[in-house]
Amino acid sequence: MTTLKIGTPKEVFDGEARVAMTPDSALQLQKLGYDCAIESGAGVLAGFSDKAYSEAGVEIKKTAAALWKDVDVVAKVREPDDGEMKRLTADHTLISFFNPAGNDKGLQAAAKKGASVIAMEMVPRISRAQKMDALSSMANIAGYRAVIEAGNNFGRFFTGQVTAAGKVPPAKVLIVGAGVAGLAAIGTSTSLGAITYAFDVRPEVAEQVESMGAEFVYLDFKEEQKDGAETGGYAAVSSPEFREAQLAKFRELAPEMDIVITTALIPNREAPKLWLKDMVKAMKPGSVIVDLAAPAGGNVEGTVQDEKVVSDNGVTIVGYTDFASRMAAQASSLYSTNIRHMMTDLTPEKDGVVVHNMEDDVIRGATVTFNKEVTFPPPPPKVQAIAAKSQEKPKELTPEEIRAQEADAFKAQTKQQVILLATGALLTLGLGLIAPVSFMQHFIVFVLSVF
């Protein structure tokens, strides 16, 4: 049987520095029985040279056309553009971010060609799939980088200091949204010494937030929120009343905060506007807002995608959409590991043959086209309930059995007391033989006072 080949082309999206295959991940893919290929220069921006790939046994292809023609599985980062879609054939399995909810044209084109497409953002958020969860991997990096970016634009220390030149107060940081990106931002902010606050509509994350050293911002409002497990770890749409209470709390916090990082997203919807113009105006000059929801329209009024702007009152609003790409080496390492784990599930025999098992919850959930059909959206994951162990009803005792048990218990208790008294008497007698008379008098008084 011919060995299948996995290939990674150079990303064509302007400014994208990540790569879907690293030399380390290529070595692991080869252990699964695959040959590996990469377009020349694909890993340069992430710090991986062609020489490093060659030393890892990866074939270097001079052009993207040559690579697409020669490989069976294509691993990418960004969704393919029109030129790449033209190169896609029925013999290809494409593994990439694909934006299936907003890319109907791409879905139809891939299905018509007969290609199998696995969208990495569609990996179900279940325990077994965590190793393949590319969204979480990239969100983790984005949350960390958001704090670093905020610090780069903030004119002071994060931590408070007392120096010979005077006292420096700690920065106050508010994280809106405590998902993967939010928790990463909280961890980074607290480790830098800032006083960190966090808000999320899901009350179950409060314990996580507080365990990381941040203060959870509670609302004085009663509303049943969906559990995070029901919404894939994302927030659900809130009621108008809850939103008003939420905005009122943000208006209260705005004048105190030095840095605000927003991360709130709702699947397949525009990001909710949570930090409005009046809140920006209420912030101190020199404050910084980082809007991680900028790719979905932004949580902040005034965010400009891929730009950094300064408001009239001196508040910097960062709307970059490439935080993960700004840490290309780390992001490529994590993403390529997600790809490798996906390939491991697709290769159960480790023989270099793709087995596209649509009965597998993870593979089915991530597959958006298969056998010339659009398979998006996927059915909800099957949650197997664990049957509770049947508890045997305790046997009812007869009056005779109860009396017998009570008698046995009385005998055991009496025996224990006799042994303790006898032991105490022997110890006292032994002590009296060797101790002075005056000591024994004091000892007897002490024992009597205890009892």
Where are these regions (language model features)?
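An N-terminal-biased, well-structured beta-alpha scaffold segment characteristic
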Residues: 2-109, 113
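Cytosolic-side membrane-insertion boundary helix
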Residues: 392-422
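Rossmann-fold NAD(P)-binding glycine/threonine-rich loop
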Residues: 101-127, 269-322
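Adenosine-phosphate binding glycine-rich loop
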Residues: 121-163, 170, 294, 300-387, ...
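A structured beta-alpha segment of the ubiquitous adenosine-cofactor-binding alpha/beta core
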Residues: 57-69, 79-80, 227-260, 264-277, ...
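Glycine/serine-rich phosphate-binding loop and adjoining beta1-alpha1 elements at the start
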Residues: 2-5, 11, 82-172
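Structural signature of hydrophobic alpha-helical transmembrane segments
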Residues: 437-448
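Glycine-rich phosphate/diphosphate-binding loop of Rossmann-like nucleotide-binding domains
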Residues: 9-47, 159-253, 406-413, 435
